[in-house]
Amino acid sequence: MDESNDKENEFGDSFLEDSGDITRTTEDEDEAPLEPRFKYERLEGESTLPFMKTATFTSIDLHDKFIAIGTASGLIYILDHHGYGNFDSVPPLKPHRCAVSKLKFDETGSYILSCANDSKLVVSGIGNDKLCCTVNIQVMPKSICFSPDFIRQQSGHCFIMGERNLVLYEKRLFQYKASNLYSGSERDGFIHCCSWNDNLIAFTNDTGTRVYERGTEKILTSVQPTHDVDRVRSSRCPPKHMWMSENTLVIGWADTVTVLKIKGNEGMRKGEIHHIFHVSMFISGISYLPKNGSDYELFLVGLQMEGEDFDDCASVMSTMTTLTAMESSATATLKTCVIRPLGLKDYELQSEDEIVNIRLSTHTLPYMIHGLGIPYLSTYFILTTKQIIMAVPYGPEDGIKWRLQYKLYTEAFEMAKEHADMLAKTDVSPKKVGRKIIEGYLESKKARVAASWLSSICGDCKEEWEWAVDRFHDAKMSTLLGDVLPDSKPRLDPSAYEKVLLASLFNNVKLFRRLVQTWSPDLYMTSTIIDQTQWRIQQISKSEDIEDVEEVEKILMDALAHLYLYERKYESALKILMICQDFQIFNVIDKHQLFDLVKDQISDLMNINSERALRLLLDNADSVEPSFVMAKINGQPKLQLAYLTKLMSRNEGIEFADKAVQLYADHEKKKLLPFLKKNVNYNVTKARKLCSDRGFVEETIFLLAKSGNHYEAVKMMVREYKNIEKVIAYCKDQNDRDLWIHLLEVVADFPTHFSQLIIEASNCLDPILIMDKLPDDVDIPNLSEALEKLLTDFTNYVELQQCCYDSTLNDLHVLTNNLMLASDKSVSVSLMTRCSLCSQVIMNTGQDMIPRKFNDIKVFKCGHIFHLTCSASEIDRRQMIEDGICIACSDNSDHVNV
């Protein structure tokens, strides 16, 4: 028993653990979050720059080539997009003595405009110092921006600065000239954000966002804030601007996103709000993801404020100081999201990420976070006080990993196949992703689903199929491979098929039998499977723990028989099939021509299926005599009858005709009469005696008639049937006058039938004879009507006969007259009449110009004319002419006869 337990543990499959659905649609019970659109990485050059570890970052701006970072110490560092800086060529700038609050590149990336609380506006050059300058002002600037054409000659080299007023600085000969574009009051608050696109300048203070048009020098439109600016102070949560194509301005302020579009020609422009909606965070940066056509998506960076004593994020923004923030339990979470605007106030959230690997202090507020992007480069940056994070769009490798993490296996595998060439050498190639999917389902106890994936994942790869077999074997789920394992293209090593067979042998015997029957024996070592099957059968027969032992043994015996057939051990296979009473034994005998091995077991074959056994016997009639078969099944008359029926349907076994009559009489009476009518090889006398003794009326009557004893047949029919119609029909078929007379004599004892017989026999007998046969002193029902009909029919018959005679005479007279007229008709003979034999003219003259005599021709009433000389050489035909027979008509008659 220890060996038994070991084998069961080796090949056993735990079906109870497999609760997975066979379909692939149910990937995970938990709904997966939105798929990220970005991954977040530190800059590569961060580790090479010492200042990155110590500096506090306060501002940032982007250009296609550079990143400019302002620090709390007043320094500005110029780095590339990967965080590397060449400080020998572009050393750090020191334009301010305090924290740099704002930075701005010009469009060419040649200059940087910066400001700080030291009341300075500084234009610094990057490899160019022609336009560098420092403007001292009386206020602390809150926002700055270059004009789009700052570097162009004769453009004025303008830039703007926002505090309470919006001031335009234009370069003159020796200094910058300041011009107020907008003057704000104290209640209007500070201008915390300004931007310049073409000739449109947008700026935002506490009263809203305005768009100023240069040239007309007027404000085109104003967008009011939708939040309470007294509670959400702009100093804590400053607004953000982003210009898009077609003069579209996106404003991110507090938790609101507004999309404003400037329409119309210069001088008649106006603003239209296309979208305005709220998001679940305080916005710190805004950019966009370009799409085809006019479609686009917005990329937002912000803080989500949470905490037990955090009632209203807005109130925190207005009242929180550094000290109160440190004491508050409100926590800030850095988040990004991608949204697609739909309607005026509706949007669709495409992705939402919480950046958990960022170190945020407990007093972090939205103004401390900056988010910028270069959309056409798909490059986005997030700046905190201590870190610079690059948001890189998800590639196929990242997308696959995320899908695998959330068990979105179908999507992961489809993406891996779509980018197979790109991912071939990575850890998310289609091959490796497929393995991870299988592993994931097996670990989740969903082995059936894993098995359903194998065809798609493994395909024609032999290595992958064999890996899957080993993996399922380790998980004790090998039986699930029975329906999916390929038997060709690819063909696996025999050990793979043997693992599945042995697992099913010990856990699912029905599957084992089916696999043995359907798989080619060339796929595995049949001798190994035979040994294990024999051992398993012995084990089952001794076990008391297995339910339905007999059924399990029968299934395994059936499978073992097929294995013996593969090994060409036909006697062993037939022995098992015979014991199991398996219908397939007949197919085996036919296929392998094994009749000689079972001809001594005909009776057993009959018990399995008599129809197939009989067919088998008849197909092998040359190998076994009918007498041998009849002797083998002597004690089974029904089988004998079935055998003889099949045998005689092939016109064989005539020596058993009398035996067949007896068997039909004993077991199939309904088929006896058809057999008697069809077969002619039985002894009629014996058959009649048998039927008579058994009281078979119809059969006895038939045999009496067949032996020629019609009188007895008629007499028995009248006596037994008591139905004169069948007797009359029989007499009509025989058409014997004496039989009718005999019938009249027999029916005389049955007066009720006599009237009907008189009517039917009137066409076959003389009425006078019928009248003579009428019984005396017997009351015959309906006799007068029958006699009346008899005489009427006879009278009609005589009249019809006379009419036919008269008609014949008239026809003869007419035909005779026509013949006489034809005989008396003359035949015209002219100079152009030709001989019917030689086709020469009858009356032609000879060379001596002497006409032929008329006795030289012969004319017949049929119209044919001959020269007597034309038939001189034909003695028989001459004799015909002399006898008055036309040669031409005789020839036509011969052709017709032929």
UniProtKB/Swiss-Prot annotation:
GO terms for biological process: apoptotic process; cellular response to starvation; endosomal vesicle fusion; macroautophagy; negative regulation of apoptotic process; protein targeting to vacuole; vacuolar protein processing; vacuolar transport. GO terms for molecular function: zinc ion binding. GO terms for cellular component: clathrin-coated vesicle; early endosome; endosome membrane; Golgi apparatus; HOPS complex; late endosome; lysosome. Keywords: Apoptosis, Cytoplasmic vesicle, Endosome, Golgi apparatus, Lysosome, Membrane, Metal-binding, Protein transport, Transport, Zinc, Zinc-finger. Plays a role in vesicle-mediated protein trafficking to lysosomal compartments including the endocytic membrane transport pathways. Believed to act in part as a core component of the putative HOPS endosomal tethering complex which is proposed to be involved in the rab-5-to-rab-7 endosome conversion probably implicating sand-1, and via binding SNAREs and SNARE complexes to mediate tethering and docking events during SNARE-mediated membrane fusion. Belongs to the VPS41 family. This is Vacuolar protein sorting-associated protein 41 homolog. The gene is vps-41.
